[in-house]
């Protein structure tokens, strides 16, 4: 008996074609000309926990310089199209434009290794949950804040790109319409992406979150991050960026272990209390009859700081970026995002506040704390060319129109056949509005963001062998080989006694 059955296999239609993003190697050609650029010694000094301001007008007197802050350097290179090259065949200004391509970088860090301290004299540290000596269930009342400090999670990282790096953190979200909530309910949270700016805090082991909007008591976090935002680089989003401008490559090393386990004081909401099915009730006379708080938190520690695991003070060579941009520095600038708290030493300074005392008294001295940081940036850049074809210009315009604007490309206008009218006092109310509005002045797309500007316009050199990073690049790439010293053989000098003996024999 024949029975008809429907086909069991499924048919898959081809996906819709997507716009192909070209690699920079497809429209950028490289020359054999390399330049070395290095910055000055970059120094910064400030208070490690907070910004010091003048009491009467809130004017900043000492900046906040924490070892747990990002340092974002905006490096500006000179425009290669304005260079006066001796060789006229390097490029044709009518059909080509010059750009820089990153080939090597070394981030130098000064100052000795040291462990930084992060703490709060009024930290919401209720009880020890690691080795408790008694059952404490009085977390819902009183002021139990204590003076607690710890060393943060150890972090070393840097990110290189021609646009600022993107960070992520958790912040308060908008409640849905029609949602019933009461005062004291936990707000919804969402993942937020923002630009990592100079001076932003990175994660110290307590999470990447907006502590200002999610911690109203200002006591659940150390002073340096209380009321601020801790950001973590969004490697996933930057890795999926279509043009690959924000992240050419990166290096990171993070480590942490749990030093102590504490609890926070405060009322545990009835909506999120420990379910009765998770425990067996205690007797009425037992203190365990009232459940203690389950609001645990850890005191992190970055552990040992060693020079064996340093990612700085060494060269990095760029052969192939992880994205489509293979190291081309559009708009002649580069963003170097650095996070390093392995040199987080807090300097303690004390000064006499009265005449020389006869006996020691703490009231005779004023105590101050400072933190210092030292950087030096070195680069090897390669001269590259972009042909001004319609395809290349259209692609670059879709990626970033300001790139073409900075090249000052002009289009020839057709000759005018008729006479034109030219008004005097065209800006006055007596005449018509002007027809041709002057082009707007180019604005900085990052004018509202904080960066450490490093201008290398006058610090470029073609003599690579005169600089440490340049010599390393020459030897690594094989562009120049140091000749091996010739071996010199010295004849062994005969002693005078042997020579006299031979003369006597001949005689």
UniProtKB/Swiss-Prot annotation:
Main location: virion
UniProt xrefs under Pfam families: Late_protein_L1
Localisation: Virion; Host nucleus
InterPro entries: Capsid_L1_Papillomavir, Capsid_L1_sf_Papillomavir, dsDNA_vir_gr_I_capsid
A cellular component annotation (GO) from this entry: host cell nucleus
GO molecular function: structural molecule activity
Keyword entries, A-Z: Capsid protein, Disulfide bond, Host nucleus, Host-virus interaction, Late protein, T=7 icosahedral capsid protein, Viral attachment to host cell, Viral penetration into host cytoplasm, Virion, Virus endocytosis by host, Virus entry into host cell
Gene Ontology terms: biological process: endocytosis involved in viral entry into host cell; virion attachment to host cell
Function of the molecule: Forms an icosahedral capsid with a T=7 symmetry and a 50 nm diameter. The capsid is composed of 72 pentamers linked to each other by disulfide bonds and associated with L2 proteins. Binds to heparan sulfate proteoglycans on cell surface of basal layer keratinocytes to provide initial virion attachment. This binding mediates a conformational change in the virus capsid that facilitates efficient infection. The virion enters the host cell via endocytosis. During virus trafficking, L1 protein dissociates from the viral DNA and the genomic DNA is released to the host nucleus.
Similarity comment: family membership: Belongs to the papillomaviridae L1 protein family.
Self-association and partners: Self-assembles into homopentamers. The capsid has an icosahedral symmetry and consists of 72 capsomers, with each capsomer being a pentamer of L1. Interacts with the minor capsid protein L2; this interaction is necessary for viral genome encapsidation. Interacts with protein E2; this interaction enhances E2-dependent replication and transcription activation.
Protein name per the record: Major capsid protein L1
Source species: Human papillomavirus type 63
